[in-house]
């Protein structure tokens, strides 16, 4: 499509499509900057791009929130231009043969909880938490998680009066059935607790490779959602989280114990996973599963895996977003993903480093993307009335919050800017002041087991790991 929108954004190749429109790669003809352009027919039956653009505007400034560059109407289309981002969690999950190890999941969980918390603090529920809606950044932001796709987001309280939306029943299912909370299946109005329960399912999906209610067959979409709901309700969290650390069970017991209007204890949830991360002896080095696949030399110097992989595939570059995801895992999913993205992988590599294993700093404005149209087979259902009754919202006993006591200070809910400057290597090879003082390892170089102790010999590995987590939330809330 040879078209310019917003006076300066030329549309390139199509990145994806979905029920709400199409996503294109775009280029700012004045600066050469690559962007993501989302188009929606202006005469769409249920237009939502204008609403979504307003959400982007209201959320601007938060860490992991794409920058809205322009919104308007061009001919027969509503158009929204935002930052171009890297691959989604679903893409990376496929790239890693549909399984993440514990270390990768814990590093992602901390950032993902922060993203959900930020939206809640700004007065909105996301209501479609799933792997497709969390993307990695590009260039200097390659280790930063972004949250996208606010088309189903809903305001749950007034920021002036702080009045919460009322409790309601008989609501239609909004979101993706695979990750929807039990109460959402039962037709109960969603609140903050539901976003967090959905996030818990995403984390278990990463660890397990699939969820117990995937692949259920039914004659109609409604029957399928009912089967998913039943299986989800009949699967105890202890069974869902079996063979994994008890912190994941504690997470579910806590979020399911929340009442409709309760404010979640986000620091407690993050502390659960931070303490587990430290107890496992992991290094906070930003070496994810896909980092090892891309640069195998990282594997020998990093504690990235809780269990060694039987074999490492050839180093390849992570995929960029795609439009459709498989509903069921397959044995060759990882290789299929690599083959499918062969051309696009090279583009990602050019932004995030060469095959030498050293990621070069991107001195231009960080490019970011939105895979707003990615979806699984469990798509947002059509309207239908729910007949199930709500489950009890009685809070669980306090035993559900038996977390390992930690010295981590409770992170302020207003601290949302992650300091990434300490993890960038300038092209001249010199470390910045932030790099010399913040004790965060550079993810673009091979991790060293003694790198922390040289910088601060009097501090324990636990203290330094905790500081690495805290740096994720230290800041003034301004976009960097």
Curated annotation (Swiss-Prot):
The active site is at 128 (proton acceptor). ATP binds at residues 15-23, 38. Residues 299-311, 395-414, 443-459 have a biased composition (Low complexity). Gene3D superfamilies: Transferase(Phosphotransferase) domain 1 (1.10.510.10). Autophosphorylated. It catalyses: L-seryl-[protein] + ATP = O-phospho-L-seryl-[protein] + ADP + H(+); L-threonyl-[protein] + ATP = O-phospho-L-threonyl-[protein] + ADP + H(+). Its main location: cytoplasm. Belongs to the protein kinase superfamily. CK1 Ser/Thr protein kinase family. Casein kinase I subfamily. This is Casein kinase 1-like protein 8. The gene is CKL8.
């Amino acid at each position: 499509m040879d078209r310019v929108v917003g006076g300066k954004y030329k549309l390139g190749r199509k990145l994806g499509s979905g029920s709400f429109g199409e996503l294109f790669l775009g280029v700012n003809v004045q600066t050469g900057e690559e962007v993501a352009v989302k188009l929606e027919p202006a005469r769409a039956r249920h237009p939502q791009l204008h609403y979504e653009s307003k959400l982007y505007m209201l959320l601007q400034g938060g860490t992991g929130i794409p920058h809205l560059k322009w919104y308007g109407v061009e001919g027969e289309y509503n158009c929204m231009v935002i930052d171009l981002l890297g691959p989604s969690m679903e893409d990376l999950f496929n790239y890693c043969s549909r399984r993440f190890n514990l270390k990768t999941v814990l590093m992602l969980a901390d950032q993902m909880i922060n993203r959900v918390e930020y939206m809640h603090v700004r007065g909105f529920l996301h209501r479609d938490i799933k792997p497709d809606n969390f993307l990695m950044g590009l260039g200097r932001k390659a280790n930063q998680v972004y949250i996208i796709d606010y088309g189903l987001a809903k305001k749950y309280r007034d920021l002036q009066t702080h009045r919460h939306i009322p409790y309601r029943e008989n609501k239609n299912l909004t979101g993706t059935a695979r990750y929807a909370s039990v109460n959402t299946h039962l037709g109960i109005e969603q609140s903050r607790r539901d976003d967090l329960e959905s996030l818990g399912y995403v984390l278990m999906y990463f660890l397990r490779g699939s969820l117990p209610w995937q692949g259920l067959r039914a004659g109609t979409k409604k029957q399928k959602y009912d089967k998913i709901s039943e299986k989800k309700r009949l699967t105890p969290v202890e069974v869902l989280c079996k063979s994994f650390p008890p912190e994941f069970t504690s997470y579910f017991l806590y979020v399911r114990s929340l009442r409709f209007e309760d404010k979640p204890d986000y620091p407690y949830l993050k502390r659960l996973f931070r303490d587990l991360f430290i107890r496992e002896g992991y290094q906070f080095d930003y070496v994810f599963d896909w980092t090892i696949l891309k640069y195998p030399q990282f594997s020998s110097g990093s504690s990235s895996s809780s269990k060694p992989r039987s074999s490492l595939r050839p180093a390849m570059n992570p995929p960029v977003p795609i439009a459709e995801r498989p509903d069921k895992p397959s044995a060759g999913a990882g290789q299929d993903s690599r083959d499918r993205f062969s051309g696009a992988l090279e583009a990602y590599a050019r932004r995030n480093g060469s095959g030498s294993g050293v990621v070069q700093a991107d001195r231009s404005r960080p490019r970011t993307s939105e895979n707003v149209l990615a979806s699984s087979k469990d798509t947002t259902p059509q309207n239908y009335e729910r007949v199930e009754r709500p489950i009890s919202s009685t809070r669980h006993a306090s035993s559900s919050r038996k977390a390992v006591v930690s010295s981590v200070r409770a992170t302020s809910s207003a601290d949302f800017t992650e300091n990434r400057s300490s993890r960038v290597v300038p092209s001249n090879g010199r470390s910045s002041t932030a790099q010399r003082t913040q004790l965060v390892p550079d993810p673009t170089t091979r991790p060293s087991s003694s790198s922390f102790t040289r910088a601060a010999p009097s501090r324990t590995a636990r203290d330094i790991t905790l500081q690495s987590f805290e740096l994720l939330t230290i800041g003034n809330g301004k976009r960097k």
